[in-house]
Every structure is written in C-alpha cells, then in structure tokens.
Curated annotation (Swiss-Prot):
CDD domains: PH_anillin. Required for contractile events in embryos that occur prior to mitosis, such as cortical ruffling and pseudocleavage. Promotes membrane ruffling by organizing cortical patches of septins and myosin II. Not generally required for cytokinesis in mitotic cells. Required for the asymmetric cleavage events that extrude the two polar bodies during oocyte meiosis. Not required for meiotic contractile ring assembly, initiation or closure but is required for the transformation of the contractile ring from a disk above the spindle to a tube around the spindle midzone. It comes from Caenorhabditis elegans. GO terms for biological process: actin filament bundle assembly; actomyosin contractile ring assembly; collagen and cuticulin-based cuticle development; cortical cytoskeleton organization; embryo development ending in birth or egg hatching; first cell cycle pseudocleavage; locomotion; mitotic cytokinesis. This is Anillin-like protein 1. The gene is ani-1. Pfam families: Anillin, PH. InterPro entries: AHD (IPR012966), Cytokinesis/Rho-signaling (IPR051364), PH-like_dom_sf (IPR011993), PH_Anillin (IPR037840), PH_domain (IPR001849). Disruption phenotype: RNAi-mediated knockdown of the protein causes 100% embryonic lethality. Abnormal polar body extrusion with large and unstable polar bodies that often fuse with the oocyte. Failure of contractile ring to transform from a disk to a tube during meiosis. Ventral enclosure defects and failure of neuroblasts to complete cytokinesis. Aberrant microtubule-directed cortical myosin polarization. Strongly expressed in dividing neuroblasts under the ventral epidermal cells during ventral enclosure. SUPFAM superfamilies: PH domain-like. Residues 421-430 have a biased composition (Pro residues). Residues 50-60, 564-584 have a biased composition (Polar residues). Keywords: Cell cycle, Cell division, Cytoplasm, Cytoskeleton, Developmental protein, Meiosis, Mitosis. One of its GO terms (molecular function) is small GTPase binding.
Amino acid sequence: MGDQFDSLMERIRVRQAEMSGEGEVAKENGPVTSKITSVKQEVASPTKVFGSSSKCNDGPSTPVHFHPQEPKETTPNMKENAENSLNSFKDATVNESSSKKTSRFSMLAQEIDEYEYDYQSQYNKPKEAYMKGRSPRMSIGETRPAVLCTPAGAQAMKSPNVAVSSKSAPEIALGMSDFEARRIKFAQPIVNVNYLPNESSIFSGGSGSSVNDQSTVLGGSAEMMNVTTSSLSCGELSMNQHITHENTIINAQSCDNREAILRERQQVSNEEYGPHTFMRKKVPKEASSATSSSSSTTTLTTISGASGSTTSGISNAPQDSASTKTTTNTFTSSYLLTKTSNNNINALVSSSPKPFSKDIGRSMFSPVHFTPKSTSSPKTLSESIFSPSKSAAVEGSIATTRRLQFEEKLKKSSSANVTAPPAPTSAPVPTPRHVAPLAPTVAQQSHLTPNHRHAAQQKKHLFPVVGIVATAPIPVQTQWRGQSNTPVVQGARADEKTAGNEPPVGAGVGKLKNLKSRWEFSSATGTPIHPDATEDSLIATAIKMKESAIPKQLGHRSERKGPSASSLYSQGARSNTASPASKSTRYEQEEEDDVFEAPEFNDGGDVISEDGILQEEEEDTSKFIDNAFGFMEGSGAGTPSPYREPPLQRLEKNRPPAEVIEEETENEDESEPYEPEEEEDDDATTQFPVPERSRKSSSQLAYSVSFYRKIQRDRNEESSTVLAGPVISQISPSAPPMSSSLTSQQKLRQLTTGPANGARIVESAKDAHDRIKRAIQVEEQLVAQSKRAMILARDKPSFRGSREEFEAQWAMLRHVEKHRALLTEYDRLKRDGPRIIDGPRGTITVSQLSVNMARDYVSANIASSKKSDEVFYFAAILRYGEQVDVSKMVTSDGGLNRRGVLEFPVPLMLTGIPPDFRATVEIYGQRSMRESTSHEDKYKLKNSTFKAKTRNTFLGGGSTSSANQSLFVDPAASSSSTSSTTSNFNLLGTFSFDINCPGKHLYNMSHTVYPLEGITQMKVRKQAIDGADITYHGFLSMYQRTGEGLGSWTRYWCALENGEMKFWKQPEDEGTKGYTALMDLSTCCRSEGASVVEDICPFPNSFHIDVWAPKMDTSDPRGIERLRVMLAADTAQDLQTWLSLINSTSKQLCTWRNPIVNQ
C-alpha cells in the first residue's frame, strides 16, 4: 500500500510541475533523477491524494509519464526495465512545454467524462440484497481497521496496480489451474457496460474467503454476477489470473473431500468487501486487441512502449496440484508503466467479459463448480442437479416408468425397422372398435429416445391424428341448454358444432386437444390441460387429476405403498371415475379381475378383438396414454365398453337358469271391498328360491358401502311407515338385495299397466270418512244460515224481489250443491272405499267462461226503445266428486252490453284431482222484475219517504210477493209451503270435459233453456301438483359434444324422481352434491317419451328423448325448438327397464300438459 501511495504522489507532483512550469526549471537546474528522488521522500496525506481526483485508480486515456519508487528487492530484468523507463521518462520531460497547459486541462476533463463512478448507497439497495440477509461486514460486526478504515470503500484495492507483498513473504510459483472458478452473481445486472478486467480483483489472499459466502461489492447480495477466476490455457502468453486461496486449496484436494472443505471454509472470515463498483463505458473493439481477459483477477504484465510486445512478468514453475497446500498470500510483482499508445491501453480494457444474462445466472449459480477445465468466460449452460430424493421421486413415478418403457419399445422397433408384435399381458388395454390401429412411422420413431425431453415441434410426431369412421348425422339438433324447466347439461352451448357439420376427427386418438376435451368432460377435477404443455408436465398433471378424481376405497388397505410398472395395465383398466366398482368392499378379492374380456392372440402375435379388428399395443400411442392416465377406452372417462360383457354377466350365463318368484305383501284395509289382484306368470315352470349369495352375484354393477347404507336406511323408513296400499319406493336395477324383484317382468307390468296394482292411494278410508263428515257438518251450518237470510228477505216487503234476496238465494244454491256432492261422495266411499289415483294429481282452472244468449232475445232488447222491466240472474257451477265451485252471480244486462255474450269473470278451480277426472260445468239462472224500491226506502234511512208502488205480476196474476218467483219454477211447486225455504235457481244447461281438452275450446251445452244458446267457450289451465310416482336409480351413458364438435359418451348415475332425471358422476354424490345434469320429462315432445335408436347411433343399447326447449333467438322470445337427448343403458335388460319407466313417467306428466304445437 505504501508503494502505491508513493507512486500516486509522484504522479501528482509531476502533473503539478507540468502545469506550473516547474518542469523546465528542474531541467535546467539539475538532473531529473535527483528531483524524482527528492519527490519520493516527501510524504503526502491520503486526504489530499483522494481529494484531488476520485478516479485515480483508472489509467488515463493518454500516456502519463511518472517513475515509481524502485523496490528494494528487484530482479535483474526489473532493474533493466526500470532503467529503460527512466530514460524514456527523461526524454518525454524535456519535450514537454508549458504552452500545453490549456490542452492538459481539457484532457483531464475528457478523462472525467469517459469514466463513470457507480456508487450504491446502503439505503438504496435492491430487494434481492435483503432477501439473503445483511452484508457480512455489517452483520458480523467487523472491527478490523484494514476493512473499516479503507479510504473510499476499498478503492485502493480496486486499483489496477499490483499489491506488493511484505519483505518476508516468499513468492509463490503457481502452475496453471484447471478447475472452474467460483461464480459471483450481482443482484442487479448492469447493462450497456463492459466490465474492466480487474474490477473484481478485490480479494485479499491473507486470510482467505469463504466459498459459500456470496457477498459482493454491492453490499452483501447473495445473487451475483458470474465472474470466473479460472486460469488461462497453455497456449496463452499472458497469465492475467489471480488465484484465490480457497480455490487453491480446493484444487489441491481430491473430489471426495470437496464437501468437507466447503464446511471448513464456512468458518473462515471474509474480506471481500467494498460498496463501490467502477466501470468503463463501452469502447468499440479493435483488431489490435491482443488479450481477452475474462475474470476478476490481478493483471501481471509488463508493457513495453517501444516495441509493443507483451511478456510474462514471472516464471511459472510447474507444481503438483495434488500435493500442494498453499497457505500464504498471493504472489507479488512490480508494475512498471511506460509510454504506450492508445491502442495498447485499449487492448487491455476492451477485452472484458460480456454482461451476464439472467438465465445463465440461474442455471450456473453455485458456490463452487468442480469441472476439469473451464474457459475464460462462464457462458456454458449446465443442467440443474436434483436432490437424490427428488430424482428418485421423478424417476419412480408411474407415468415416467410407462413413458420410458414405451420409448424403449419404440427405439427397439425403429432399430429393427419392423414393428414387433405385442407380447401378451395379463390385462391388456382394449382399443375402441371403431378406431383404426395407429402405427408411428420410422421417421417419427427416430425422434424418440429414452430420457429425452421432446421439443414442441416433436410432440406432433408422438401424437399423430388419425381419422375414424363418421357416424350418421342426426336429423335434429343434439344439444343441451340451460333455462327454467328445460334440460341443463354442463359443458355444452347452443353455438357449438354438431357431429354432422364437419368431417369428424377421432375423439381422443392421439391429439392433445382431444385429450384435453376428454379430461374436461370425464375427470372429476375439471382442471383443463394446455395442449402445448410438455410431455412431463402433461403426465404429472394427469397423475394428480387421477388421484383427486378417484376416491379412496372404504375399508381397504393396500399392501403396496406405491403402484409398480407391472400393474399399470390392470390398474388403468380398473380406474373408473363414474363407476364405483373399485370402491366396493365386496369386490376386494376380485380386484385383479378386469372389466373387459382379455383379447386372444393368434400365432402371429396379432390381437384378435370381438369384431375382428387388429390391434397393436405399442403402435397405438393414444391407447398407451389412456392407460397411463387411467382413462377407459378413448373418449369416455370411466365408461365401460358396451361391446364387452362384464365378468359377472358371463358367470351368470354359465349358471343354470332359475326363475325367482317374488312374494309381495300388501297392507290392506278392512273397509276396502276391492283388493288389487296380482298377476301371475303362466309361463313359470320351475319355482324355487335362490340363495342370497347367488342373488348378490347376479348383479352386474358394483356399488359402494355408502350406497348400501342408503338402501338400508330407505328400507327402515319404509318399514316404519304404515301404508294402505302398494307404494313404489326407490329401486335400483342392479342392487344385489333387490335386483331380482326389481327387474322382474311382473314388477314392470305393475309399473306400466293396470291402474289397480300400479295405483297410489292418497288417504285411507278412515281418514276420508272423517274428512267428509266434517265437511258435511260445515255445509249444513252454511245452508241453515243462507236459509234464514232468504226467509228474512222474503218476509219484509221492502226486500222482496230485491238484490239482497237473490244474493241469499245464490248462497243457498252454493251450499246446497256442495252439501249434496259431499253426501254423494260419502255414500260412494262407504260403498267403494277410498279413491285410487293412477298417476300424479293435478289442478285445473277454468277461466274466461262465456255463454252465448239467444239471438231473438238479444234482438228484441236492442230493438226496444226502453229498457225491459224483467232481468235474469245467472250462476255457473264447476263440479267433480265432492268438490264444487260456484261462480259469482251475473245479470242479463251485462250480456246485452257485450253483444249477447254472458261472461263469468271469476275463475273456477278444482284441486288435487286425479288425471282420469271428468268434470262438469252447469249454468243456473232465474227471472225476476227490476227492483223499484230505492236503497233509502229499503233500509228506512232519514230524509226518505216510503211510497207503496204497484207492480205487474210476474206470471200475469197474483200479488206482489210473487215477483221473486223464477220463470222456470213450476207454479204448483211455488204454491207449496217449501217454496220460501229453497232457492229458485234452476239448471239451464250443462257440459263435461276431461284432461284431454285443449287450452281454449268451444263446447256445446246439453239441455239448454231459453234465453241461453247451446254454445259455450272457456279456457282450461291444467297443472300437476304431484310429480310422477315412479322412482328409479341406475347408470346411464349420456352423449355429449366436445368443443371441437366431436361426440363423447360419459357414464352417469341417474335418479328418476318426480318426473325429473338427475345425473351425478357417482352414486355417492346423490344427496351430498348438486346434480351434473337435469332433464324434466314434462317437456317431452311425445307422451311416449323415449324411443329406441336403431339406425343413427352406433352405441349399443341407446335411446333418445325429444324435448321442447325455448329458442335462444332474442327476436322470438316465446319460440320453442325441438332438441334430442341421446342416452344409453348398460345392458339390453336395463334398456327395456329404462324405456318402460321413462315412457310411463312421461305419459303421466304429459297428461297434465296442454298439447304443444311447434310454430
């Protein structure tokens, strides 16, 4: 350090002498050597030195002439070089003139502009500097003066001059190092600059530095810029490398002791501190560049200005690195600078390394890299090293093992240039029958090597697209849309493509987008996979989706902690997200049985399927992916192939046929005279019970424990409830305890035919008796009240023939008719028992009831000049069974004002009636004279005078009391004593209607009486208050379209309840999760509901249901369109069961619906 300060002071003295003209005086008075010697003996303070210029570390752009102090220990070469430098210095000093004072200032100003001082304050550090902790110098409490008291933040340590060691320190002759240097990464990469070759040479070799400590000149940041400290190759002339102490020790040891060395070096303090970074602006590279510096090492060269040749400063003695143990400081040398040209200076500066990139820093970041040889620039990428546990987890995954096996097979087949036949396995994966076999070409197989990451452009060779046979186009649009009371299915929209619009492409056959679509419709997670994802990420995501989609088995413990590669075939075939067969505890012993039939192999090794299609396992990449990911046969997620029979069904075929007779017990009430008759099968020849074990094994589908518990819970609820007749409960076509009884033909006949056995009794006979008795008592009281009001109105002359008297007669008519209907129903109940309702009950509402009046009566009133003195009162009655509803009373004046149409504005209603009802509408009326007494006279109000008025008799004779008599009453009956206690309303016409009537229709009345005409019009609104009484549970496959317009069959758990078909992914989801799809059977286009598909759908056991749905067109908000829903059962027997139940339910629901006509 002292020698450097002396050199700097001498340089400053020379500059001051040149500016003040002292140079010429010194030349005249004495030799230059004595002046330089006297200048060397003067001591300058550090404050003055660094106060003069903050950039005294860097060399100027123009030659600077000064002579440093000669070292005490020099070599002969050094002495000779010193003499040459003194001679050149004398010549330059004589030629200098004081006239260049102004130009010298401009040169100094230019130097300041060309250099840049980047000072990073400790309070303005980036975020990354704090993520790894504070600076070591601040955190460990550094107190050494050499570190804390260094002027300008270790500025002298960054000087291009070489630090000279003490006298006692011996020189170290080091050989060429072949190890890779430690990587230093800056927190903030500095761009648009070229780093000086020696700007990072701030390491102190006395105590050494920790290898793991990554503090830098930016204040302790852990992520730094990579700077190599490796040595040059043998062919290089200059060795501008600074070998640090720790690298020397690491190079001396063997590779086995590297970790131990790193742990020992962590305890050593670090002196690589300094908050400043000096850099030079970019200088264009020149052809005269002689060296290429690449590391933060100390320059050790001697530049000759006369000849421009570069020679080595010291001699390098060869030394064995394996036995060398260096514990001393770095080597020493003298630095002699002479007059050189700008090109020679730029040759050292412009060869700095390029700025470090962020990507390289991430891949190369490591405390120490152990490589045999390293270049001068750390630009070589290296693969990231995983930990042993992570590597074992990645290499041991199921999908990775399957991928490696598949690539190995492809490699073998490509080397032989012949596709080898597949070896028979215990449980091979079946291929869909409508898909052609897939065979990759040799060119495609050449890209596939084991343990090779496929690039994006190579994935298209691994998954080629293969077309399949197109299905016939569907006549009607097949889609699902969501609105109220319309079918709803997730994953489909109205604007999606149909199967017949474009040429179909294989769904899920070697295309990532199709594979993504299968996951969207089939997996339980619903997480989409990007089609451009790499193969490894694709497999990893598929494994996660498979684990989350398949619940754990209840009561089952796996003996193996992880799946092996040998069990992938059977494991992939059993992984079914829709069917819970793998979750049943009853099938633990049958876990190894595959749900598909094992294909046969011929002598040539080809796989022979049931329909004769050849398959080759290693050639079908889509089949391999489906197997590895846990899919079942191509486009279906968990849909078993309908072309193969389940193993349980094959066992059932081998068993001798036996017919099971179900004994049904029914709770019958003693008061019921008629009992439902059970139909017996005349074709039954052998009748014997089947054991419980065989009954369980006859089921074709497995269920989970939760499903069995649900059935048991439903049984307990049914046993605790006392019913008056047979009630259809929740049934399942394949549940083992109930399979034989629910799929028998006898039960189907009970569900679909015969109102006696398949009917529903709403209430018992006792309850019906009690209810009707109470209703009769109420109506008797109301009849008595109406009778008293009518007698009171007739006894008083002021109310005789008034509106109040006719209101009392209307009330009397209403309650008398209700009482009469209740008595009739009570007699029927005692005779026939409670009413049996076949199907859901409903409600009808009759509105806009209008009756045409006789034309001659309307014409006479219109032609008359004054209003007629007679008036007619009318009332309408709607009746069915014990229910009677009476309309408000209207007069003939309202009909005359409406062109002869008599309207009843208040609607009539019947509630809770069976679908086989037949209701009757009756019109009652009577004739009377207009009221002549005013309101004040009737109620004897003040300021009113009672005036008796004579009236014309109604029948041409009699007193005024006869004015309230009806036109239609018999004179003999009117003269009897009971005429004052009965209503004078008489029947003028009647007509009937049933559930098949349209919404608004004209009816012809029978027994019509003047002044009514026999034409009536009304609007009937029918609405079911009960859903369908059929409840059924089972599996159904649903046809859906993907985003590309392709078809996909997905298996769902379906529950038919209350006329609605609800779909879930699994049986356990029912009652705990919301349904995936809903279809209301009341929207069926036909009352038959479902029909079998035989010509347009290749899926076996399929059927379709046509429904009405509102149009999505905003211009026609009330428009409807016809949609078709495609479904499929598992077996032919299940198909017949579903068709019978759906058609019966649809028929029951459509009976309460008005006929829909598509406009």
